[in-house]
């Protein structure tokens, strides 16, 4: 159970994310596939990262991106090591942030997305605690014809010892 821990081994976080994605895949009758790319430099049992910061972005990719497309959705989760941090890139081929906002109902618009706002609050707390700058960057992806090709989220996480 990682819910009470501030930091977990990368391997534990990957296991939790994989379980979450498998459950959502079953729930949505395999409407999406996912791929995990792990930098071989990451020691999955020795490198610790803040717990539960990646999952809300996977949830957004599924619910607000992929569920809006016809055909099979794709999610890629890539973890890369750079000195004392791990960069996590979550990329989907969904409808994109602009279209997702357009198709929201008035009820959905009134409801704030708590998952990502909680992550941002946690990042601010962790930044103050560790004296570092963790950040999240959103990139809208487009096909050559200008149509949306999905969303990329880049999360910089410290390796915590």
Question: Residues of each region from the PLM?
Answer:
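A short beta-strand-to-loop motif within the catalytic HATPase_c
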Residues: 128, 135-147
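Intrinsically disordered, glycine/charged-rich C-terminal tails and inter-domain linkers
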Residues: 159-161
């Amino acid at each position: 159970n990682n819910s009470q821990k501030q930091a977990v081994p990368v391997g534990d976080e990957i296991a939790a994310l994989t379980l979450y994605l498998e459950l959502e895949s079953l729930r949505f009758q395999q409407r999406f596939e996912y791929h995990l790319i792990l930098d071989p430099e990451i020691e999955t049992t020795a490198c610790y990262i803040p717990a539960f910061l990646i999952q809300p972005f996977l949830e957004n990719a599924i619910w607000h991106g992929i569920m809006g497309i016809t055909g099979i959705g794709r999610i890629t989760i890539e973890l890369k090591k750079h000195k004392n941090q791990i960069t996590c890139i979550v990329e989907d081929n969904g409808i994109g942030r602009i279209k997702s906002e357009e198709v929201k109902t008035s009820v959905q618009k009134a409801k704030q997305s708590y998952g990502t706002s909680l992550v941002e609050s946690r990042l601010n707390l962790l930044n103050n605690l560790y004296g570092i700058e963790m950040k999240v960057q959103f990139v809208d992806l487009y096909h050559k014809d200008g149509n949306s090709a999905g969303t990329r989220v880049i999360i910089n996480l410290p390796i915590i010892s």
